[in-house]
A protein has these predicted regions:
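Bacterial N-terminal signal peptides
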Residues: 2-11
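Extracytoplasmic copper-binding redox domains, predominantly the cupredoxin/blue-copper superfamily
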Residues: 16-131
Length: 131
């Protein structure tokens, strides 16, 4: 392998190593009917993975708040969300143990609110902070 090939391979390896997986649990506390994302605030970079996992209280979903999003940010989030059920919305996660992965797209630094549609009335919400 030539020098250029080694440099390119090193760059790819460094980028892959820099990717962080953030695990977010979607859960319910049956004692007080509290629904939540845990953690509820995630600080990430473009390329990181958000792994949402239903622990209890299904069904759940992940919906990014459209209010205040630029058209570019909205398009980037929609493109990053596989199997969307609607604009900025994951499919419904109907069983405990279900997972949903989002690779953080190139977004401007800032805060991006999200919530669980079935439990929005219970204030099940979170925030993605882009560095």
């Amino acid at each position: 392998m030539g020098l250029l090939g080694m440099v390119l391979l090193a760059g790819i390896s460094a980028a892959a190593a820099a990717q962080e997986v953030h695990q977010i649990r979607l859960q319910m506390n049956a004692r007080n009917d509290e629904y939540r994302f845990s953690p509820s605030t995630i600080t990430a970079r473009p390329g990181d993975v958000l792994l949402f996992r239903t622990v209890s209280g299904a069904p759940h979903s992940v919906v990014f708040e459209p209010k205040g999003l630029s058209p570019r940010a909205r398009d980037a989030l929609n493109s990053a969300m596989p199997r969307r059920s609607a604009d900025l919305s994951s499919p419904l996660l109907t069983e405990d143990g279900a997972e949903y992965r989002v690779v953080v797209p190139p977004l401007p630094a800032g805060a991006y609110a999200f919530y669980c549609l079935p439990h929005r009335a219970y204030d099940m919400r979170g925030e993605l902070r882009i560095r």
